[in-house]
């Protein structure tokens, strides 16, 4: 696993030990970032269920201003910290070991701005059934209620291939859906209101 492009292009990343995380392949990340390209410069990024931090670190390498990394798994937090130290990106980011499904005021973006890019790469079990997908939608609604999302923010939800997106998250419009091997990426844009 490596940084695909930007100021840290080609730098290797470590992944958390164990079977809890499923790092996104370089090919899938490259395709995702080709889609998100125009949204990355000066972005304020929220990387939920961050695992190794590869998604958020890639945005920082490509010109994002700030990234908040959130994961409840101590091995994931450790891997993200190691990668951030290796890339010398600690000043442009913060790592929080918390449950991403329960956002509170601790998750707000610095300076009162809203996040412009949100990554949600939860365990597949959360996207596998309606109850888990509902919990993710409630998380997105809570982020909006807390004022954490900028109008027009772009969000990516990763799910196992074949998992239907019953409906976009509250306040979001689905604008793209891509499947790569066993992974489907749902891309949504925040409209600025809850539906």
Residue spans for each PLM region:
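Class I S-adenosyl-L-methionine-dependent methyltransferase catalytic core
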Residues: 1-195
């Amino acid at each position: 696993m490596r940084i695909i492009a930007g100021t840290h292009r080609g730098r290797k990343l470590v992944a958390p030990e164990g079977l809890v995380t499923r790092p996104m392949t370089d090919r899938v990340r490259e395709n995702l970032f080709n889609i998100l390209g125009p949204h990355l410069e000066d972005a304020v990024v929220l990387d939920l269920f961050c695992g190794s931090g590869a998604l958020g670190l890639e945005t920082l390498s490509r010109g994002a201003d700030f990234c908040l990394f959130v994961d409840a798994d101590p091995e994931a937090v450790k891997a993200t910290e190691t990668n951030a130290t290796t890339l010398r990106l600690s000043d442009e980011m913060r790592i929080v070991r918390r449950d991403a499904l329960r956002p509170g005021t601790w998750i707000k973006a610095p300076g009162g701005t809203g996040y412009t890019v949100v990554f949600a790469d939860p365990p597949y079990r959360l996207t596998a059934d309606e109850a888990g997908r509902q919990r993710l939608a409630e998380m997105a609604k809570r982020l909006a209620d807390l004022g954490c999302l900028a109008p027009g923010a772009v969000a990516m939800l990763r799910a196992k291939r074949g998992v239907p997106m019953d409906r976009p998250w509250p306040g979001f419009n689905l604008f793209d859906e891509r499947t790569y091997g066993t992974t489907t990426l749902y891309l949504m844009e925040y409209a600025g209101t809850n539906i």
